[in-house]
Amino acid sequence: MLEIAEFINPTPSPLWKLARQAGVDLAVGGLPFDSVRQGEAPWEFEPLRRMKEQYEAGGFKLVVIEARPPLNKAKRGLPGRDEEIATVCTLLENMGKLGIPVWCYEWMADFNWVRTNTSKPSRGGSMVTSFDVNELPKEPTELGSISEEELWVNLEYFLTKVLPVAEANNVKLSMHPDDPPLSPIRGVGRIMRSIDNFRRLVAMMPSRHNTVTLCQGNFTLMTDDLPSAIRSFGKAISFVHFRDVRGTPTSFEETWHDAGKTDMLACMRAYRDIGFDGVLRPDHVPTVEGDSNENAGYSSFGRLYAIGYIRGLHEAVYRG
């Protein structure tokens, strides 16, 4: 069954009430970096238990963790990677004990999602984020370049260690695509950037715990037929980011959920057709009048529009 969730920080805020008032009671959470006690790490059992209970006290069930312990050494194959991998194994073991079924991770070395503008004007004076490869610095990062094949080798090493732990604890590893799906960036290869590469990931270690986060804003930059891509991955999809963009991998802007390049209704039908059983959350919403752009893409009021739009599509497809 497809259910709507929201990404909510573990510290209570007005967004908690807004989400509940919009009918959302499933939380996608981070890790409790800001609330650990002396001697604790955020991926250990007690901090995670307290975080889960805090969500529950606010009326939410924690269903996905979408944050990572430090992983750059693992991605680059540097000394210390085994220690980083061990922290991931600890996280997965504790997620299993607490009944948190999905861990969303990514394989972007050195930097995460990249934008060159976080206040591009959009509909009615709202603001969205955008990307233009020509506005990026050209020099390599301080760690230097790394090839795509090196990243594949390091990912396989990582999965060899981590996937058995995920399987033993019934936690799905859910790979998020590169954002943007473009390679290289500043000399750093990016491998989770195409439909074929995601097929390679799934085939590398076939397992119902080796899965895909279908982030629509990235996947729609990889294909002009996103509903077909959804159907092709089928049961390998464990988590969905529902958003849209306009443009190409080298130059794009994010959009309101009803104003991008993608047929969002057709996507919702595709999730129904594959029998998607998991959570979908709105992602990267516009900043609207009366809200802060300090955390661009995560405007509280913009999320309310997205939740309502998604709920309407869901009702039309699943009950229409």
Residue spans for each PLM region:
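Structural motif corresponding to the early beta-alpha repeats
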Residues: 30-156, 167-168, 218
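Basic, amphipathic N-terminal segments that precede the first structured/catalytic domain
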Residues: 18-35
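Active-site glycine-centered loops adjacent to acidic/histidine catalytic or metal-binding residues
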Residues: 27, 176, 215
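Active-site-proximal beta-alpha loop/turn segments in soluble metabolic enzymes
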Residues: 136-151, 177-187, 291-293
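Histidine-acidic metal/acid-base catalytic patches
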Residues: 1-5, 10, 16-23, 56, ...
